[in-house]
């Protein structure tokens, strides 16, 4: 590291906004850590849209790709490396909720990224609320190293009553 001109040559994070096509307007963070390239989607619960390892894609994107489309689940499902399902649809007692839940379609707030000892830390909050219903906050933080991704999720109930919730991490591998 002493002879390195700038740490961003090997470890970096950049805010990215897509400008064209169906993904136009999507806000993301693109992270490079040597062997890994990871795209975090701020507009979709800070889920991971894609991962490349040593330059090779290891995640699945559907035909829809990253998009800003409104419509049915089948019309807007992106796939992505990490697709978080929940918090209102993951349990045996839930009925009449959308497939995969609504969390993925909620924007992250208070989003940050920083370099920390050769890793990149990315985090933010995702709030799932309803009038006369839930007030749940997902505090999400990732640590991306040269060849690994660690996730830390903490759910806080900011409502006035107890609330049931669940999270399911759908990992989509592809090539």
Q: Model-derived features: where do they sit?
A:
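Surface-exposed acidic/polar loop and edge beta-strand patches at domain peripheries
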Residues: 1-150, 158-166, 170-175
């Amino acid at each position: 590291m002493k002879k390195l001109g700038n740490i961003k040559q090997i470890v970096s994070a950049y805010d990215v906004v897509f400008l064209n096509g169906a993904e136009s307007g999507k806000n993301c963070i693109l992270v490079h850590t040597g062997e890994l390239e990871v795209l975090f989607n701020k507009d979709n619960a800070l889920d991971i849209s894609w991962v490349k390892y040593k330059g090779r894609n290891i995640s699945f994107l559907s035909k829809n790709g990253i998009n800003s489309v409104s419509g049915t689940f089948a019309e807007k499902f992106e796939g992505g490396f990490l697709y978080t399902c929940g918090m209102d649809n993951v349990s045996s007692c839930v009925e009449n909720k959308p497939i995969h839940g609504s969390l993925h379609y909620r924007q992250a707030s208070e989003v940050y990224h920083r370099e920390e000892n050769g890793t990149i830390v990315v985090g933010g909050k995702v709030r799932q609320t309803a009038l006369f219903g839930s007030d749940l906050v997902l505090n999400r933080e990732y640590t991306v190293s040269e060849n690994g991704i660690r996730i830390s999720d903490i759910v806080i109930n900011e409502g006035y009553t107890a609330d049931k919730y669940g999270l399911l991490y759908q990992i989509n591998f592809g090539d």
